[in-house]
């Protein structure tokens, strides 16, 4: 077993942005990302298309999650179904990363994915 007391102490922060694609899409539409029902789908024109992200409320109240299919989303006027906006997602992710750089050196930020 490793004796961690011999290692230097460091503070590490891990950030995972909650339902990132859905949250960014919701904010862009003027919606509350925590309470709205929103799914980002690979292609809204194809019923078999995969849900890339679902808002927390859509997950909780309708059981729709990443990997679900468009045809599984019930027809409900409260649910927003949108196509991905990759340029927007990349821009927002970049801005958030730049925010981290205000507090820690760039070499200390290790980005795993866009979200």
From Swiss-Prot:
Residues 12-115 form the UmuC domain. Gene3D superfamilies: 3.30.70.270, 3.40.1170.60. Mg(2+) binds at residues 16, 115. It holds the Pfam family IMS. Binds 2 magnesium ions per subunit. GO terms for biological process: DNA repair. Keywords: Magnesium, Metal-binding. Its cofactor is Mg(2+). One of its GO terms (molecular function) is metal ion binding. The keyword Phosphoprotein does not apply. It comes from the Bacteria. The keyword Coiled coil does not apply. Belongs to the DNA polymerase type-Y family. This is DNA repair protein homolog YozK. It comes from Bacillus subtilis (strain 168). The gene is yozK.
């Amino acid at each position: 077993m490793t004796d961690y007391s011999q290692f230097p102490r460091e503070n590490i922060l891990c950030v995972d942005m909650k339902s990132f694609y859905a949250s960014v899409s919701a904010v862009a539409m003027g919606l509350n990302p925590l309470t709205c029902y929103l799914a980002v789908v690979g292609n809204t024109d194809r019923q078999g298309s995969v849900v890339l992200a679902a808002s927390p409320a859509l997950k909780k109240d309708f059981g729709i999650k990443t990997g679900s299919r468009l045809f599984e989303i019930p027809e409900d006027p409260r649910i927003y179904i949108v196509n991905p906006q990759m340029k927007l997602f990349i821009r927002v992710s970049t801005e958030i990363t730049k925010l981290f750089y205000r507090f820690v050196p760039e070499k200390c930020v290790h980005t795993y994915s866009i979200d």
